[in-house]
Amino acid sequence: MYWRTLWGFLWLWPYLFYIQAVPIQKVQSDTKTLIKTIVTRINDISHTQSVSSKQRVTGLDFIPGLHPVLTLSQMDQTLAIYQQILINLPSRNVIQISNDLENLRDLLHLLAFSKSCHLPLASGLETLESLGDVLEASLYSTEVVALSRLQGSLQDMLWQLDLSPGC
C-alpha cells in the first residue's frame, strides 16, 4: 500500500517541480503593450492634449519631466512618483492608469531580475509632501500636467526598452 503511494509520488515528482520560465521576450513584449495601453488611456482623456509635456508650470516642478536615457531603476523611480501623484488625484479618470502603473512597475522588476539587477525601493517620494497643498490650489492643472508628462515619459520608456536599458 505504501509502496504504491510512494511510487505514484515519485512518478509525479518531476512534474511537481517543473516550472517553465517565462521567456524574457514575452515579458518585454507585455511591458511594451502595457505602456501603449496606458498611453491610449491618457489619450482618451480629452483635456490632456492642452499642455505640452515639455512646458514648465510654476509649482508643479515635482512632476518628473522627460529624461534622455533611462535605466530600469530610473524608470521604476519615475513610475513610482507618477503613481503617487495619481493616487492623490480625486479624478476617476486616473484610477485605472494608476493600477496599470503598478502592473508596469512589476513588469520592470521582472525585466531587472532577468538581468540580475536589484531595483531598490523607490525613493524620492518625500518630495511629494507638499502635494496636498498643490492639489488644493490647482487640482485640474496638476492632473493635466501629470498625465501629459507621464505620457511623454512612457513614450521615452517604450523607446528605451528597444535599446535594452541597463540596471
Curated annotation (Swiss-Prot):
Signal peptide stretch: 1-21
Gene Ontology terms, MF aspect: DNA binding; hormone activity; leptin receptor binding; peptide hormone receptor binding
UniProt-listed GO biological process terms: activation of protein kinase C activity; adipose tissue development; adult feeding behavior; angiogenesis; aorta development; bile acid metabolic process; bone growth; cell surface receptor signaling pathway via JAK-STAT
Main location: secreted
Keyword Secreted: yes
Subcellular location: Secreted
Database matches in InterPro entries: 4_helix_cytokine-like_core (IPR009079), Leptin (IPR000065)
A Pfam short name: Leptin
Annotated S-S bridges: C117-C167
Keywords: Disulfide bond, Obesity, Secreted, Signal
Keyword Secreted: yes
GO cellular component terms given for this protein: cytoplasm; extracellular space
Function text: Key player in the regulation of energy balance and body weight control. Once released into the circulation, has central and peripheral effects by binding LEPR, found in many tissues, which results in the activation of several major signaling pathways. In the hypothalamus, acts as an appetite-regulating factor that induces a decrease in food intake and an increase in energy consumption by inducing anorexinogenic factors and suppressing orexigenic neuropeptides, also regulates bone mass and secretion of hypothalamo-pituitary-adrenal hormones.
Family from the record: Belongs to the leptin family.
Record's protein name: Leptin
Naturally occurring in which organism (per UniProt): Macaca mulatta (Rhesus macaque)
